[in-house]
Design a protein with these regions (language model features):
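N-terminal Rossmann NAD(P)H-binding glycine-rich loop of SDR-like oxidoreductase domains
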Residues: 1-23
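NAD(P)-dependent short-chain dehydrogenase/reductase
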Residues: 150-173
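Substrate-positioning beta->alpha
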Residues: 86, 90-93, 156, 177-192
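NAD(P)H-binding glycine-rich loop region in Rossmannoid oxidoreductase-like domains
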Residues: 35-93, 97-100
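Conserved beta-loop-beta element that borders a ligand/cofactor-binding pocket
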Residues: 130-153
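Short-chain dehydrogenase/reductase
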Residues: 84-88, 118-127, 176-181
Length: 226
């Protein structure tokens, strides 16, 4: 399968690129000049700006799947303005590049919601999802809350609180929806999504991510009503 990947130099994107290559897929990675060294060997390199579709729109085809992972690193409530300038703009430009290229599957990294914090981040990612849906391209939304990985392990201290929350019916659903996931789980889920295009839309949240996407994906209606 031919995959066009943005965010390939990030900790998640580089892991996914390596896994897709291991599975025998062709990966074309969008990178800024000077960032090539952070992309796994074997990727086809495309130089461009994720915030300007015109810099790479003619280099997307012939891709079957477009995977968009660009976003502000280490999201926090103080980065609301950055979310709109980077996460939202890059999502809009990705859709603008994917549509004319004729890709038949758009995989979008979103965020679990609703949640009691990071409202601006949730809002921007919801807007990104809406743009993907409006494009008409069959899509997969992957919605983690927090991804554990190199330099991202401090939330493990919250695991006892999650365990307690799962004991009570009133808090069980929220604890599952906002569960912590690992880099390996995210990598496997995204790779599974690439290889399993939906007819219209599928959504993976932490319960599905924890098993690498092997639980049935949820529809938009099911996710909204949970």
């Amino acid at each position: 399968m031919r995959v066009f990947l943005t965010g390939a130099t990030g900790f998640l994107g580089s892991s996914l690129a390596a896994e897709l290559l291991r599975r025998g897929h062709n990966v074309r990675a969008l990178v800024r000049p000077g960032s090539r060294s952070r992309v796994p060997p074997g990727c086809d390199i495309v130089h461009g700006d994720a915030l300007r579709a015109e810099t790479y729109v003619d280099k997307v085809a012939p891709a079957d799947t477009f995977v968009h992972l660009v976003g502000v690193s280490h999201p926090s409530p103080s980065k609301a303005e950055e979310f709109r300038k980077i996460d939202l703009v890059s999502a809009r430009e990705a859709v603008n590049a994917a549509k004319p290229a004729g890709v038949d599957h758009f995989v979008y990294l979103s965020v679990a919601r609703p949640a009691p914090m990071m409202k601006a981040y949730q809002a921007v990612r919801a807007e990104g999802e809406a743009m993907v849906i409006a494009s008409g391209i069959p899509a997969t939304f992957v919605r983690p809350w927090y991804v554990l990985g190199p330099g991202r392990s401090w939330p493990r201290m919250l695991q006892p609180f999650y365990a307690v929350a799962r004991l009570f019916p009133a808090t069980r659903a929220g604890a599952n929806r906002l569960a912590l996931v690992t880099l390996e789980q995210m990598t496997q889920t995204l790779a599974w999504a690439v290889e399993n295009r939906p007819e219209q839309l599928q959504i993976f949240e932490p319960p599905q991510i924890k098993v690498g996407g092997r639980l049935p994906a949820r529809s938009e209606r099911e996710a909204a009503s949970a």
